Amino acid sequence: MANKNAYAQSGVDVEAGYEVVERIKKHVARTERAGVMGALGGFGGMFDLSKTGVKEPVLISGTDGVGTKLMLAIKYDKHDTIGQDCVAMCVNDIIAAGAEPLYFLDYVATGKNEPAKLEQVVAGVAEGCVQAGAALIGGETAEMPGMYGEDDYDLAGFAVGVAEKSQIIDGSKVVEGDVLLGLASSGIHSNGYSLVRRVFADYTGEEVLPELEGKKLKEVLLEPTRIYVKAVLPLIKEELVNGIAHITGGGFIENVPRMFADDLAAEIDESKVPVLPIFKALEKYGQIKHEEMFEIFNMGVGLMLAVSPENVERVKELLDEAVYEIGRIVKKENESVIIK
């Protein structure tokens, strides 16, 4: 008992940690899928790859966090969707390589274990996993007094997926003449928030700006990142997509060239980009140069596909949502991305 009291006096609440584990079990259970072995709480999560039915499996992994969007979740005391952001950032990256997400692990570090709040965070992670078809097979909650303030926490995630070796998407199939199709984003997603916070530093979040179509600012800023897995997987299975770009930090300019060879470029018709109201507000209130917006944000397109012209109609048919023909692949002359 003396040791327990000593640890508690140093700021670590072991009992609260146990409570967190008990609270999250029901959320983790929602994510179970074929291949999961063992139960939550072991030293390592286990997954039986043979259950996927993939003949020549290649594992593809990704890790990410949600950046300073967390600071807005803390500021507005809304923690139930930030976990979905974390999952989205990881699984959208690996789907861009052709991988079906299999499982996910999360890492939460906090200054003080608050079981109710941490349950909300993990519930959001679980919801993201359900949307991605990934099992939440493990994680870590680290209470680190002195490292973080009592109300602060950080969140990171790790996704592992599998692809058929012949269906890996690595940019080698993208050719001149391919059509660029944009899939809508849900909002800012999880990048550019250091700038977003500066632009809206003097706002409470309760404001309904005229550009935001009746929504409160805080609702728009914390809109969870869209997860594209279930929309895009059927396209990968039918081998209809030559390249995929997840539009994250660096916007169009940094991310689109990652899906094709150095001798190619993306020519984008700006008038076809479905720019969301929040980006118009950011440009206006932040006095950001228009061309710079495309270097920072997704501008309304969270995922971009390079598709052979003869496959465009089939892709649209399978997606069953608004699909934006925003450009094409051309031979590179100077820039890798040309926005007209």
From Swiss-Prot:
Please report the name of this protein according to its UniProt entry. Answer: Phosphoribosylformylglycinamidine cyclo-ligase
The entry assigns this protein to a family as follows:
Belongs to the AIR synthase family.
Q: Which UniProt keywords apply?
A: ATP-binding, Cytoplasm, Ligase, Nucleotide-binding, Purine biosynthesis
Q: Name one Pfam family in it.
A: AIRS
Keyword Cell inner membrane included in the entry's annotation:
no
Write out the catalysed reaction.
Answer: 2-formamido-N(1)-(5-O-phospho-beta-D-ribosyl)acetamidine + ATP = 5-amino-1-(5-phospho-beta-D-ribosyl)imidazole + ADP + phosphate + H(+)
Extract the GO molecular function terms from the UniProt entry.
ATP binding; phosphoribosylamine-glycine ligase activity; phosphoribosylformylglycinamidine cyclo-ligase activity
Q: Which NCBIfam families match?
A: purM
- Organism phylogeny: Bacteria, Bacillati, Bacillota, Bacilli, Lactobacillales
Which BP terms in the Gene Ontology apply to this protein? 'de novo' IMP biosynthetic process; adenine biosynthetic process
> Can you cite an annotated GO cellular component?
cytosol
Q: Where in the cell is it found?
A: Cytoplasm
Under the heading HAMAP family, the entry gives: AIRS
- What is the enzyme's class at the highest EC level? ligase
Gene3D superfamilies recorded: PurM-like C-terminal domain (3.90.650.10), PurM-like, N-terminal domain (3.30.1330.10)
Pathway given in the UniProt record: Purine metabolism; IMP biosynthesis via de novo pathway; 5-amino-1-(5-phospho-D-ribosyl)imidazole from N(2)-formyl-N(1)-(5-phospho-D-ribosyl)glycinamide: step 2/2
Q: What is its EC number?
A: 6.3.3.1
Q: Which PANTHER family match?
A: TRIFUNCTIONAL PURINE BIOSYNTHETIC PROTEIN ADENOSINE-3, TRIFUNCTIONAL PURINE BIOSYNTHETIC PROTEIN ADENOSINE-3-RELATED
